[in-house]
Design a protein with these regions (language model features):
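PP2C/PPM-type serine/threonine phosphatase catalytic domain
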Residues: 1-139
Length: 139
């Protein structure tokens, strides 16, 4: 059953239905009055995807970040640890992260999950979608 969560940083919501695979993880976190981070991780492969999405989310949940460079560095660290743990296989996840700093919203997107900006009745794609075969972490 989908769950709904109002985010602390404005008019936003997350809808999540993990009844099929349970490999998705999301976080919503207000670091201070100016900075908030929201992220969705979609675990892939059906084998270690849930572990990967959970680990990536925990990494961001426990850290203090104030820039997209900080988000990118944390995700790179999580990637290296998961890659070593799985020897290049199985522990895979996408990451879609928004970092609100003041009135600016920054997006970091890794993988094939599309990102859309919705304002009123306008829907604008911020990223494309993957087309064709995608080869994930096979060493």
């Amino acid at each position: 059953m989908p769950t709904h969560s109002d985010l602390p940083n404005g008019d936003a919501a997350v809808f999540q239905d993990n009844s099929f695979h349970g490999e998705d993880t999301y976080i919503t976190r207000e670091l201070n009055r100016r900075i908030a981070i929201d992220a969705v991780f979609d675990g892939a492969t059906g084998r270690g995807g849930g572990d990967a999405s959970g680990y990536a989310a925990k990494t961001l949940q426990e850290a203090t970040v104030d820039s997209t460079a900080g988000v990118t560095a944390l995700l790179e660290m999580a990637h290296q640890r998961l890659f070593q743990r799985g020897r290049g296989r199985f522990f895979l996840t996408t990451a879609t992260v928004t970092l609100k700093i003041g009135s600016m919203l920054h997006v970091v997107n890794i993988g094939d999950s599309p990102v859309f900006l919705i304002r009123g009745h306008d829907i604008m794609p911020l990223t494309g979608t993957a087309q064709g075969a995608t080869f994930l972490g096979i060493a």
